[in-house]
Curated annotation (Swiss-Prot):
GO terms for cellular component: cytosol. Its EC number is 6.2.1.1. Keywords: Acetylation, ATP-binding, Ligase, Magnesium, Metal-binding, Nucleotide-binding. The gene is acsA. Catalyzes the conversion of acetate into acetyl-CoA (AcCoA), an essential intermediate at the junction of anabolic and catabolic pathways. AcsA undergoes a two-step reaction. In the first half reaction, AcsA combines acetate with ATP to form acetyl-adenylate (AcAMP) intermediate. In the second half reaction, it can then transfer the acetyl group from AcAMP to the sulfhydryl group of CoA, forming the product AcCoA. CDD domains: ACS (cd05966). It comes from Psychrobacter cryohalolentis (strain ATCC BAA-1226 / DSM 17306 / VKM B-2378 / K5). One of its GO terms (biological process) is acetyl-CoA biosynthetic process from acetate. Disulfide bonds: none annotated. The lineage of its organism: Bacteria, Pseudomonadati, Pseudomonadota, Gammaproteobacteria, Moraxellales. It comes from the Bacteria. Mg(2+) binds at V539, H541. This is Acetyl-coenzyme A synthetase. It catalyses: acetate + ATP + CoA = acetyl-CoA + AMP + diphosphate. Its cofactor is Mg(2+).
Amino acid sequence: MTQKSFPIAPEFLAAANITAEQYAEQYKQSIASPEATDAFWAERAELIDWIKKPTKISDVSYDLEDFRIKWFEDGELNISVNCLDRHVRNNPYKPAIIWEGDHPSLHKIISFKELHEAVCRLGNAMRKLGVKKGDRVTLYMPMIPEAMVAMLACTRIGAVHSVVFGGFSAESLGNRIIDSQSKLVITADEGIRGNKRTPLKANVDRALDMDGTDSVSNVIVVHRTGNSVPMSGRRDIWYHSLVDGESQHCEPEVMNAEDPLFLLYTSGSTGKPKGVLHTTGGYITYALSTFRDVFDIKEDDVYWCTADVGWVTGHTYATYAPLANGTTTVMFEGVPEYPTWARIGHIIDKHQITVLYTAPTAIRAMMKEGDTFVRESDRSSLRLLGTVGEPINPEAWDWYYHVVGGSKCPVVDTWWQTETGGIMLAPIPGTVAMKPGAAMNPLYGIVPEVIDTDGVALEGAAEGNLVINSSWPGQMRTIYQDHARFLTTYFTEYPGYYFTGDGVQRDEDGHYWITGRVDDVLNVSGHRLGTAEIESSIVAHPATAEAAVVGMPHDIRGMGICAFVILKSSETATESLKSELNRHVRSEIGPIANLDAIYMVNVLPKTRSGKIMRRILRSLAAGQYVGLGDLSTLADSSVINELVEVVKTERAKSH
């Protein structure tokens, strides 16, 4: 597996925070022994302002009979103090957030002092509404500064936030409110992206009509578009009238390092989304530490992570890590193509952005439009590029490096998960030549292993399942209200390891290449969707008897969604029924669950025990009709020819 590599530009190397030799030495030291790992993280914890410094660094056991993950357990802190107060003391007027609105005429610069005041006002108002330490608060927000204000106000008063992506449907929102038993919802009248409006408040109203949402006592509504929305007298309150007149001082809640910080729901291989729980001290230590390492951060950086706050990247690397470090973070409400595909470049120039962290999906979409739009901007302020969410294909990497970055900016291809809290694998800039598509090296304290399906650790160049043979401070602690599922999902299949659910190749240089999910989870545009969740949505449609969902190659999104559907005998396969099914799924889960291909079939390939053989469907969805592997366990191998005919016919129509 020999791969082309790109050396780091000499001018970048000259100013890099760390050299290849320093990385090798520090990494070796950070994993030398459990004591050495603790010593490393004790040193990194010095980046945090603690109310009470921890003396116990880690207490971890992956033994299912005596399972525990604790970091800095006797430490006390408040994250909002780390993100705000300490910078207000040292540099109050430095921009904390640069907000770029959906329309290019809209932007706002918010200093650390102003952000601190806004957070304190909302924190005080939330306390008056009866929100206490440990209470859950659901945020369903557009990409506006109030979203970050609300996250930080929760951390100020010790409430646990659960941010739900504004593109999710009312039903998805309702299910998350029910699972978290939230006391408060914070939303906006509407969201606006690409000049299209999303009815956020209307979706909240529909979600709160669902049984089991009685825990919600109030809804705070931010005025964004000004369109009229129904406000229910006692329950609903306008954000701006609520915070006006509140004090600019809000006493921060003293939090134990292991107190819950936030819930973030992510798709699993079973239908029900799981509430990933992160705690306070370990999460912020890991977030800040990895941010500084991976992005080679300098004092005057203007840093733009394009992720929505509804995803984990928007939590860790758009909000908490940059603000904890005192770095200016850029927040963009819109989409890359509005008003034209030149928008990203114009934003880079307008705010003199130095570091850009975005998803391969966005890069592929821009690349498809050619170089002209990108070349409308200068982009000379950029010094570092990053990618996140899914493995980047080498063609997109090349274009990002050469065209967007002008062949001078290193590209950090980062691998991590909602569950890991922060980046786990990445080529720390200045330490290694880059290989397009490779996540390269583990970060400090992280011990990746490649293991086969029998759980045997493989040496040298190898391909298998990616597991982590240790704990780290940013690791999730449990699935909210379902610890048994947490243990089963991550620690049971390969005892003694954290199982990532991803496949990996390690090349002869020891560098890691992520190959994609090995479970029934799809990675669409860098966002995870469970096949079971989509299947149950399809089967909920009255015309459908059974469905199987698999991933398929997609030019822009990396992975598309393909559904094989058996209709009830009374139904007839038509194009209009396909459109109706797609609308149904999008309304139940959200537009992200768009079905790219729907094949109406009479049978599904099943084993004698009744299991659907998804690998066959994956091959067919990718247009591979021969060499389908071992079919001996199929109950009826003649179904393959029938399926191949359906897929071939449909694909011929669409081409």
